[in-house]
Curated annotation (Swiss-Prot):
Annotated protein name in UniProt: Transmembrane protein 248
Protein's UniProt keywords contain Transmembrane helix: yes
Entry's family note: Belongs to the TMEM248 family.
UniProt biased composition (Polar residues): 80-105
Transmembrane segments: 21-41, 179-199, 270-290
Membrane topology: Multi-pass membrane protein
Region named Disordered: 78-106
Keywords: Membrane, Transmembrane, Transmembrane helix
Length: 314
């Protein structure tokens, strides 16, 4: 009568076919990996690989800039009714425009204002300003923040609107100027091609951002990371000045993620692949339980021949 001993057959199968056992284990591990990856895509938001740059990565580029506010710079008075030049479009005008995208390149530079953290770290000789400094402005080129291609040569005007006046009152109070941290309104003025085309950060309004009654702005020189670590680095680059640093905190809402439909499709493909691999492993396992040890085992010695052994015995 035909009988099957599953455990004995499985032991014989494992001992007689080690490579196939290793293959089964590898396929099982791959199936588990695909299953885990599919579940990960289902529950997690994944950054889209098709979008090379979003506003998070763009604003992080400014973290590498050093801004020098020199004590010798001339203050320029601003009136509260200062308006944006006619040659510059605000981002609101750009959004409401019905022009096709290709005409934006001919419309001139645009303004985009975002809130950002600005740290001003005065050096010891710096004595501060007697006037209320509310605006810092600078001009850089695209390559200074790591842009490439045509955008590397584009000019970017940066204006920081401080929420409160920055003057020498605190310097006189403490005997020296201390580091100050502002949540400033940074206005970037550049060609439309410089900016990412993804979801934009919340905007601030420079004209109503500062509570000072008298406005003064001062020019700052910018230095990128490549210049800072170059061999001809000047240690007295910002002597008798204050070094400004920009800090952007990552905003998850600005990251472009893979759409839900695409994530579901990826999850479905990974699940189908893992199921197929599991079926393959289960099939081989059932075969091992039923078949057991093979009927004929090949000898490890290639010179072994049963016919020759029989003739020798005769």
């Amino acid at each position: 009568m035909f009988s099957i001993n599953p455990l004995e057959n499985l032991k014989l199968y494992i001992s007689s076919r080690p490579p196939l056992v290793v293959f089964m284990i590898s396929v099982s591990a791959m199936a588990i990996a695909f299953l885990t990856l599919g579940y990960f895509f289902k529950i997690k938001e994944i950054k889209s690989p098709e979008m090379a740059e979003d506003w998070n990565t763009f604003l992080l580029r400014f973290n590498d800039l050093d801004l020098c506010v020199s004590e010798n710079e001339t203050l320029k008075h601003l009136s509260n009714d200062t308006t944006t030049p006619e040659s510059t479009m605000t981002i609101g005008q750009t959004r409401s425009s019905t022009q096709p995208p290709q005409s934006l390149e001919e419309s001139g530079p645009i303004n985009i204002s975002v809130a950002i953290t600005l740290t001003l770290d005065p050096l010891k000789p710096f004595g501060g300003y007697s006037r209320n400094v509310t605006h810092l402005y600078s001009t850089i080129l695209g390559h200074q923040i790591g842009l490439s291609g045509r955008e590397a040569h584009e000019e970017i005007n940066i204006t920081f609107t401080l929420p409160a006046a920055w003057n020498a009152d605190d310097c006189a109070l403490h005997g020296h100027c201390e580091q100050v941290v502002f949540t400033a309104c940074m206005t970037l003025t550049a060609a439309p091609g410089v900016f990412p085309v993804t979801v934009q950060p919340p905007h601030c309004v420079p004209d109503t951002y500062s509570n000072a009654t008298l406005w003064y702005k001062i020019f700052t020189t910018a230095r990128d990371a490549n210049t800072k670590y170059a061999q001809d680095y000047n240690p007295f680059w910002c002597y008798k000045g204050a070094i400004g640093k920009v800090y952007h905190a990552l905003n998850p809402k600005l990251t472009v993620i893979v759409p839900d439909d695409d994530r579901s499709l990826i999850n479905l493909h990974l699940m189908h692949t893992s199921y197929f691999l599991f079926v393959m492993v289960i099939t081989m396992f059932c075969y091992a339980v039923i078949k057991g040890r093979p009927s004929k085992l090949r000898q490890s010695n290639p010179e072994f021949c049963p016919e020759k052994v029989a003739l020798a015995d005769a």
